Amino acid sequence: MAAPQGGYPPQEGYGQPAGYESPSQQAAGLAPAPAQHGGRKKRAYAGEAFELGSGANAGLGGQLPAGGTYGGYPAQPQAAGYQQPVYGADPTQMQAAAQGYAAPAAPAVAQMTQQFGAMGVTDPHLMPPQPVPQAAQAPRPVLNHLYPTDLLTQPFNVAELDYPPPPIVLPQGTSVYPSPTANCPPKYVRSTLNAVPTTHSLLKKSKLPFALVIQPYGALHDSEDQVPVIPDQVISRCRRCRSYINPFVTFLDHGHRWRCNMCNLTNDVPQAFDWDTTLQRPADRALRPDLNHAVVEFVAPQEYMVRPPQPLVYLFLIDVSYASVTNGLLATSARCIKESLERIPNADRRTRLGFIAVDSSLHYFSIPRDGSENSDPRMLVVSDLDEPFLPIPGDLLVTLSECRENIETFLDKLQEMFQNTQNNGCAMGSALRAGYKLIAPVGGKMTVLSSSLPNIGHGALTMREDKKVLGTSKESGLLQTANSFYKSFAVECSKAQVSVDMFLFSSQYQDVASLSNLPRYTGGQTYFYPGWNAARGEDAIKFAREFSEYLSSEIGLEAVLRVRATTGLRMSTFYGNFFNRSSDLCAFPAFPRDQAYVVEVAIDETVTKPVVCMQTAVLHTTCNGERRIRVLTLALPTTQSLADVYASADQQAIATYFSHKAVERALGSGLEPAREALQAKAVELLATYRKELAGGSVSGGGLQFPANLRGLPVLFLALIKNLGLRKSAQIPTDMRSAALCLLSTLPLPLLIQYIYPKMYSLHDMPDNAGLPDEQTGEIVLPPPVNLSSERVVPYGLYLIDDGQTQFLWVGRDAVPQLIVDVFGLPDKSQLRVGKQNLPDLDNDMNQRVRAVIEKSRDHRSKGCGSIVVPHLYVVKEDGEPGLRLWAQTMLVEDRADQGVSLVQWMGNLQEKV
């Protein structure tokens, strides 16, 4: 059997809810028991009086039995000397369980076996591991078992969101060689269904979507995520469907020919296929990377190039109006570019840079080569905004290697040139037009840094936000583009291999809805910094770190992406930031490494094969001027059983698909239709499961759903409550538009965290949390906590992190010693709230809290690239109300603003089902 998961251990009895049964929590994928660290004694900040299961890390069933554990963590011994003051209230009454939504006590094994037996299911923990089926025994292996659960009596446990997707169970001998890397790891490609229906009618009956979530790169730099590179330029492709040879082809005719696993055509094996070009001797075919690895990169020969590989080109369009000078953007960005010149990829020494400054005129800069007689940069001003022209086309884009010193001199002077400006104009649309003229012959990236609404020249926009329409049906109009220039110009850019990235910093309305069209159709991204000001150290540091990471990341250039599949399957719809050049070809002037794409798959003909394959290919030029093709091949079993389809469905991939659908609906029809569609879909899935797989009605009015999809209704509720979609009259349009950009571009792990943030209880962390793991050296995070105020105790300290923003929540009754240890302050009243960085103190608790905050920001460990460094806000429960309410919107299981609580949501779904 091919390896079921890239790097994930095969799971026995996948998806059984953890925290509801006593058996083997370890098998359920929860954290291991803490390692002992030299007998270090842990401070306990929660006193004896509150030790009755009301804390965040208490068991889901409320009170734990004596010596019980939750999530594999032993009960914490209390250290002396941190007695909790008694507040007069009975601590056991502090967190009444929500009515009708209390977790059951762990049932006895016999009782559970009986219950599962009644449903025709054996308890997965009691079953022996499934033997791998032999080819002779059964042509089709047993796919994942369906484990029904009741969403009302067994509430969702946040730890389930960290489970890997259901295993991909392939028949033995599916891959040509038995390689553990033959199938694509979920890090790169995830399917919403890990068992594919053989017919369109079965897919339609399931009501589940069939789509791929594709993230071709796992990091911003090759060194952090290495895949096998095949340098010999021998690329074997199917003559008919143009698929690349991969681990799932079949060799015939003594290995001289191969049968395509997509369309069944027989092809000749190229003559040089078994020759090692480096050592100039015959090679062992069984060792070829393209036959052993699902993810490979081919160095492309000449025929894959329309023109010589383009150099990396960055053209910076910098707002130099009054707003940009006063908030410090001009000075900070100039300094940051200067300090990052060393990090910009330039291995082939062809990288070119250009600069245009923008106010009510366009200011071009001619930068001479290093060592020239006159090393001063020249500024050329063009005030014709309708037909902006290039004053001296030759000297405006300069080679970084040849002009490095003079570029640094220019960046030092740039701030001084405009420091006394009073100009409020911003002709950014005209600057984009001029920039396009400058780099269209070679292609490249236009990086816009702006603090103003473009108010004159091409693409001029007006202040159209109206607080009276926020939260009403008219609000959706504000999310539409106000000027057609931004869409039509973006398409022009795409055709000329020009990509646009927007860095937006206004404290006023900036029309992110219109401006974000440029990145959307050119493979770029919109980075939004509301209320940014360089005078706040935290703001300046965040932007500097992110922009430096942005400039250093290894992007692909002049790229196209295509997905091919087994005969009978067709890629029908594509979601993400690119231009759809033809029915199945997505064009990227620049290919970023911090975005994901969703492709919907249609079943046009009945599939007769036991396995289908889908192959993603990204043809691109590396920053070093090499033409390459990255190929990712995913094989999935097929099934005629609806139970198999449901048992192998991936809740996180499904949530990602519906996130993209919801953004499309919000921009097309409005926010209310988008929210209604999500609720209707949740009801439809629950009703379908009840009717088709749970035997119609369920006694006792439960809400049945498979264990592997238990998080889906919660993720739908969290998506409806996300900043981009939730019903509220308090959300500025720019904030909402920026959130919609994230919902349609974030890689899957970051998207799930953005929809359902992570919350960690820090005052009662397990002993090993915040310290390096003895085996891996990685910092251990505490177990995550459900996003409900019922999990928050008044004496607690919590980290809430959605990947974009972090909140450090300080309870109103936090003990003084906790404040001393973490913040170095004698009294909570002296604790400043808002954006800040934690002080670095010489004590165990401070170091561990800092380590957890930093580890929670680490996107590399989540298997994806990102430049984002979240702000940390300190929030006091009894502090500034606005900040507190903002942090509380993260608790998506609570009732807030105009949204229902999880209990109400489940009740609504149950009524509608």
Swiss-Prot record:
Pfam families: Gelsolin, Sec23_BS, Sec23_helical, Sec23_trunk, zf-Sec23_Sec24. Zn(2+) binds at residues 238, 241, 260, 263. Residues 238-263 are annotated as: Zinc finger-like. It is found in: Cytoplasm; Cytoplasmic vesicle, COPII-coated vesicle membrane; Endoplasmic reticulum membrane; Golgi apparatus membrane. SUPFAM superfamilies: beta-sandwich domain of Sec23/24, C-terminal, gelsolin-like domain of Sec23/24, Helical domain of Sec23/24, vWA-like, Zn-finger domain of Sec23/24. One of its GO terms (molecular function) is SNARE binding. Its main location: cytoplasm. The keyword Protein transport applies. Residues 1-44 are annotated as: Disordered. GO terms for cellular component: cis-Golgi network; COPII vesicle coat; endoplasmic reticulum exit site; endoplasmic reticulum membrane; equatorial cell cortex; Golgi membrane. It comes from the Eukaryota. Residues 1-37 have a biased composition (Low complexity). It is a peripheral membrane protein. InterPro entries: ADF-H/Gelsolin-like_dom_sf (IPR029006), Gelsolin-like_dom (IPR007123), Gelsolin-like_dom_sf (IPR036180), Sec23/24_helical_dom (IPR006900), Sec23/24_helical_dom_sf (IPR036175), Sec23/24_trunk_dom (IPR006896), Sec23_24_beta_S (IPR012990), SEC23_SEC24_subfamily (IPR050550). Keywords: Cytoplasm, Cytoplasmic vesicle, Endoplasmic reticulum, ER-Golgi transport, Golgi apparatus, Membrane, Metal-binding, Protein transport, Transport, Zinc. GO terms for biological process: COPII-coated vesicle cargo loading; intracellular protein transport. CDD domains: Sec24-like. Gene3D superfamilies: beta-sandwich domain of Sec23/24, Sec23/Sec24 helical domain, Severin, von Willebrand factor, type A domain, Zn-finger domain of Sec23/24. Belongs to the SEC23/SEC24 family. SEC24 subfamily. PANTHER family: SEC24-RELATED PROTEIN, SECRETORY 24AB, ISOFORM A. The COPII coat is composed of at least 5 proteins: the sec23/24 complex, the sec13/31 complex, and the protein sar1. Golgi apparatus membrane; Peripheral membrane protein; Cytoplasmic side. Component of the coat protein complex II (COPII) which promotes the formation of transport vesicles from the endoplasmic reticulum (ER). The coat has two main functions, the physical deformation of the endoplasmic reticulum membrane into vesicles and the selection of cargo molecules. This is Protein transport protein sec24. It comes from Aspergillus oryzae (strain ATCC 42149 / RIB 40).
